[in-house]
Amino acid sequence: MIREPVVAGLFYPSRKDELIEQIRICFLDRRIGPGELPGPVEKNLQNPVGLVSPHAGYIYSGPVAAWGFLEVARIGKPSLVVIIGPNHTGLGKPVGIWPEGFWETPLGRVPVNEEAVEILLNSSRYAEEDTLSHLKEHSIEVQLPFLQFVFGDFSIVPVCLMDQSPTVAEDLAFAVRELMKSFRNVLIIASTDLNHYEDQKTTLKKDYLVVEAIEKRDSRLLYEYLVKEDISMCGYGGVAVLLNLGFSSVRILKHATSGDVSGDTLEVVGYLSAILS
């Protein structure tokens, strides 16, 4: 079973050579991006790592995303990547895991790790096998070309969340901890953008509250801020999973908005790259 790309040519270039060049531009961007390319990754991850990574079009969020992938490359190469993305389409199960086969991008095919899928399904009360939730969803797909560019070969577990409640976040964190017993060199990505379509000043204020909750590694505070301050962050459930995993350190690598790229500060979207270890 092959999951074909649905936002190639929209969120990122559909031609391999153009996509590689776009990713290089994101890394080499000195204004918002890190200003450097990742070098060869010669060692494997020794312990699990969490990553908060944006999922907008590469021209907007790609330079911010590059910070996270550059930092993971410095730590080591994952053999398994669990990617938790929000369900923007309303299709499929509340917690849908793509069970088998490959995900395709212009850079090639990425295998789904069926052993890891089985562990998550058996350890979670809410996760179900589901392809429908993934068919038109972009939040997981846009992470793959960056991963392919930096690491080459790896396997994935794609997890799509329509239900992003605290209960589900706690349940999935338990399931991921069970997974970590078998896969130590695993990268867990929470794919999310931050506040949406308000002016720059308002978005910065709201985004910094999200950053505060992440820095404190406090998922309850995150949910509190989302409700109290009306923050339209789309992938908060995946971030809550990371915050519930018991990582001992958090580093905020980069925050920016679409307004920093386009110059339009009336309606912006916030982007964050952060690493947990």
Swiss-Prot record:
What Pfam families does the record point to? Memo (PF01875)
Q: Which domain of life is it from?
A: Bacteria
Record's InterPro entries?
A: MEMO1_fam
Which chain regions cross the lipid bilayer? Answer: none
Q: What does the sequence similarity comment in the record state about its family? A: Belongs to the MEMO1 family.
- Name recorded for this polypeptide: MEMO1 family protein CTN_0605
